[in-house]
Amino acid sequence: VKSGAYPNHARAYENVKSIPHYLKRVGYRVALAGKTHIDPKPVYPFEYIDEFAEPEDEDVPVIDGWRYPKVRNMLRESSEKKKPFCLFLCSNEPHSPYTKGDPAPYKETKLSPQQFNFHRQSYAKYLAEISYFDGQVGEVIRMLEEQGLRENTLLIAATEQGSGFPFGKWTCYEMGVASGMIASWPGNIEAGSETDAIVEYTDIVPTFLDAAGAPIPEVLDGLTLLPLLRGETNRHSQYSYSLQTTRGVNGYKAPFGVRSVVGGEYRYIRNLFPENEFSIPVSRNLMKETALLDETEKARAARYLNRPPEELYHVIKDPYCQENLIDKPALQETKNRLADALSNWMDEQGDTGRDVELDAHGRQANWYKRN
């Protein structure tokens, strides 16, 4: 999101440029508050605001109607000095152990086909944290309105990835990589408009540069979203690519790299180590929790842990990726088209698959290695 590069370039080297470099050149103040997870600092020369990264065990108190006075002060200064700004507000919500907000309204919420009944309490807490995040966004909007900045500010609210429940985060299933994104810019984006165009996080940096009137470097992987947001087109990218590694994830046992592409109505998934069992803390907890359940529930858990070399899902009819269509004769052309697109993208990215996966831990971002 901050460098404009695909996630297989997670480790940033000293010569890499990021959004602060690009926007500062055209006079912008570029700041970040909250969750950082970036390194080395010279590659990301943000102005860092010590707010928004909240303690897990308590809500931030509201004082004089506000929770984030430092963020508010930054916006006030930008308004008074008529200084254009780009501000990343990186919330930690929702994230386990899910301690923010009130879960009571969500205790009877219907579970998805991916979840198990013993997840109900955690799911209610997860939804409570989403409501808490919604409140954070609302407070930022109030700050912009207070300072007279709302009408001329492009606001994008986006989620990081799917939930931390099975078949979500740490996978390339639809609920693992599909993310919510809402954009608002009075006079530029029609309120209430929607699109099913395929977009990616790599599109954020070129979009902000375009909105600021800054040059968009050809080296960036993404494309500006402004024509799409302004309703000038209803198409963007033909494909969106995803990848996942278990290498370096706390408690992993064996490599289980995943690559995926979505195009149109179908998602194709390539599991690089199908001979291995998918193993991270969530998977091992799942086996313990389903040990005494019936065979149907055990089979669902086993499907999460043991996967075939290839998978294909109709993500419109089957967004929870329950029916693998990889062997359907009528879909072989679709499968081959997506498989070729994924292979071509991997070649472009220098991703050789299994070999890259085995070397992944040595190429992770330094901040991740330290944690």
What is the meaning of each model-derived region?
Residues I316:
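C-terminal helical cap and adjacent loop that interface with cofactors, partners, or active-site loops
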Residues V1-E311, P319-D347, G353-R354, L358, ...:
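Formylglycine-dependent sulfatase
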